[in-house]
Amino acid sequence: MWLYYTRLAWLSLKRHPLLSLLMSGAIALGIGAAMTTITINYLMSADPIPEKSDRLFYVQLDNWSPNEPYDEPNEPPDQLTYTDATALKAQAPAQLQTALAQSGGVIEPQGLGKEPFLARLRLTHNDFFTMFNAPFLYGQGWSDSADETGDRSIVLSKSANEEIFAGENSVGRTVRLEGKEFRVVGVLDEWVLKPRFYDVTTGAFNEMEDAYLPFKLKETMELPNSGNTNCWKMPEGEGFKSFLTSECVNFQFWVQLDSA
């Protein structure tokens, strides 16, 4: 029976080659589209950190206009203002907590033949590395005092460390970023989160950052904004400080609790 139907298929293929090709292509396209949809759905629904996902919480506050909702009624913005993020860090009683912001800056590697490059930066607090199980290849995160003072400490990704230091243990060495010298305190091992859940506002499947800096440097170095910035009213005044005290949302905040 199988040979009979195989023969019929072969005769039909010879009789209508173009139609057979189109039908095969349509079936292949359908299978490809279905597999792509299944893969995306699997990645988006998978728990990226199952060992503690029930203890990690993303904080939202409603700072939006009293006259109109941010999006849907009773739905707060998906990010925070700088004022709210820093106040939460200072006053929240969580076991671990961190504010987050995305930025960018030029790193100038030392050595012949090494060109400056624009690095993806993540401004955060040192709790970030513990909360999200960041794997370290060398060193560790910066100290609590670096969070408080805005010490120019830096944690590099594995790829950035390879670009700047050829993959060597660079802890204790210096990196020039935005014209300032930073001390390397740690280098991450290969780390890929799919989805990159700690900041889905800028893309759940965006690439991981090249370097991580103390959050306070956002203010002291006046580092540029990146990602999504939304304001319900314009900042009062001019300059960088007026943005930080404005009602514009561009920051994230996470807490880890002892139990769910």
Regions found by a protein language model. Give the residues of each.
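Amphipathic alpha-helical recognition patches that constitute DNA-binding helices
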Residues: 1, 8, 23, 32, ...
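Mid-to-C-terminal secondary-structure elements
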Residues: 126-142, 152-260
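Short, strongly hydrophobic transmembrane alpha-helices
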Residues: 16-48
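A short amphipathic helical element positioned immediately N-terminal to and/or at the very start
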Residues: 2-14, 84, 88
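Residues at or immediately flanking beta-strands
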Residues: 24-28, 56, 174, 181
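Structured, solvent-exposed hinge/loop segments at the ends of secondary-structure elements
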Residues: 38-164, 168, 178
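Alpha-solenoid HEAT/Armadillo repeat architecture
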Residues: 14-15, 256
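Short, hydrophobic secondary-structure boundary micro-motifs
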Residues: 21-22, 98-99, 196
